[in-house]
From Swiss-Prot:
UniProt cross-references to PANTHER family, sorted A to Z: 54S RIBOSOMAL PROTEIN L1, MITOCHONDRIAL, LARGE RIBOSOMAL SUBUNIT PROTEIN UL1M
Keywords for this protein: Repressor, Ribonucleoprotein, Ribosomal protein, RNA-binding, rRNA-binding, Translation regulation, tRNA-binding
Self-association state and partner proteins as the record states: Part of the 50S ribosomal subunit.
HAMAP family recorded: Ribosomal_uL1_A
Cellular component GO terms held in the UniProt record: large ribosomal subunit
Annotated organism of origin: Methanococcus vannielii (strain ATCC 35089 / DSM 1224 / JCM 13029 / OCM 148 / SB)
Stated name of the protein: Large ribosomal subunit protein uL1
Origin: domain of life: Archaea
PROSITE patterns membership: RIBOSOMAL_L1
InterPro entries: Ribosomal_uL1, Ribosomal_uL1-like, Ribosomal_uL1/biogenesis, Ribosomal_uL1_3-a/b-sand, Ribosomal_uL1_arc, Ribosomal_uL1_CS
GO terms of biological process kind: regulation of translation; translation
Amino acid sequence: MDSAQIQKAVKEARTLAKPRNFTQSVDLIVNLKELDLTRPENRLKEQIVLPSGKGKDTKIAVIAKGDLAAQAAEMGLTVIRQEELEELGKNKKAAKRIANEHGFFIAQADMMPLVGKSLGPVLGPRGKMPQPVPGNANLAPLVARFKKTVAINTRDKSLFQVYIGTEAMSDEEIAANAEAILNVVAKKYEKGLYHVKSAFTKLTMGAAAPISK
C-alpha cells in the first residue's frame, strides 16, 4: 500500500460522501488477519504522530497546581486543579464529559495517585490516562506533539478505525498520515503488512473506499 494507492482511495472516499455544512473527518479503517489478539503481545497499543498534523485542534487537559497550572492556563489549555479533581471524583457524569471532550491529559507527577482515584475509572477504559510530568516541566513540546498525535488500541479486536485528517487537507497530506499508521503496523509484526486483510478510507458521512494492495 503506497502513497498513490492511498491517495486514490481518499479521492474515492470524497466522492462517496455528500457535502455537509461542517468539515468532515477522514478515517483509516484496518482489518487485521491471522493474529491471536487474545495474546497481549499481538495487540496494537500505540500513539502515532501524524506527519501532516491533524487539520484541527485537539483539546488537552492539564491536571496540575502552582507554576505548572499557571503555565497551562497561559497556553490556553484546560486546567484541572486539585479541588476540581476531587469534585470530579464525586461526579461521574462530569468526569465522563471531561474525558470525552479532551483528546489527551497531562498530570503533575505528584498528583497521579489522586488522578488514579478520581479519574482513573473514567480515563482508563478510554485509553486516556495522563502523561505524568514534573512540576517544573516545559509543557510546550509535549503539547505540540499531542496536537499531532492519534492513539490506537485494538485490545482483542481485529479491526481498528483511526482519524487521519479532515476533508480540508490535501490527498497527499492525508495519505502521508495513513502511511505513518501503516508503517507502525508493518513494524509491529514479523510479517508486516501481510497481516492487513484490508484497509479503507472514509469520510464522516460517507461510505468506505478500499485501498488497493
